[in-house]
A protein has these predicted regions:
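Short acidic low-complexity segments
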Residues: 61-72
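Surface-exposed short loop/turn segments
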Residues: 69, 75-120, 124-139
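Solvent-exposed, acidic/flexible segments
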Residues: 45, 49, 96-100, 138-150
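Sec/Tat-exported extracytoplasmic proteins
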Residues: 56, 60, 107-111, 131, ...
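A structural "domain/chain start" motif
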Residues: 2-6, 17-61
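Sec-dependent N-terminal signal peptides
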Residues: 7-13
Length: 162
């Protein structure tokens, strides 16, 4: 009984300390200090723009069409995706690819003052390639690309929340 009590107190203490320093699980909680955002992008209707807009709305942030109506303006300056050979087999065939996705952004206040200067966020994944199973490996690459896009969006939202 004494051991259970000590474990309970220790768990409560660790939880209190973690919550007190602002730590939280990824994807939990909301962005409290942001109410409205405008997204400026050359490709307004590409997958990244749409996913960013959905994620902001899921965090109770209104995405407005006019930059003057927004509390913040996220400017997407550039977006790149690359797929490079990471390793080759003994028979000189691709056995692993490196996927990299980058997005260059700026965050501006409503008055146009830069809050986050031009910053490039990036993420990468590696995946094994099997030439005998090309379709499933392409599906895996597409899944990894969606995960990478979501990771970049989380990075943008965390910078917006900072």
């Amino acid at each position: 009984m004494k051991r259970f009590f000590c474990l309970a107190i220790t768990g409560l203490l660790v939880t209190t300390l973690a919550a007190g320093c602002g730590w939280r699980l990824r994807g939990t909680g909301s962005v409290d200090n942001v109410s409205s955002v405008h997204i400026s992008s050359q490709g307004r209707f590409n997958d990244f723009y749409e996913a960013l807009s959905r994620s902001l709305q899921a965090n109770d942030i209104t995405v407005v069409k006019n930059a003057t109506d927004a509390q913040y303006n996220i400017v997407i300056l550039d977006q790149k995706y690359s797929r490079k050979t990471a390793t080759v087999s003994v028979t000189v065939r691709v056995s692993e690819y490196q996927l990299t996705e980058e997005v260059t952004i700026m965050i501006l206040a409503a008055n146009g003052q830069p809050l986050l200067q031009r910053t490039t966020l990036s993420t990468e994944r590696f995946f094994d390639f099997d030439e005998n199973d090309v379709q499933s490996k392409e599906d895996e690459a597409n899944l990894l690309r969606r995960e990478m896009r979501n990771d970049l969006i989380r990075q943008i939202i965390s910078r917006l929340d900072a």
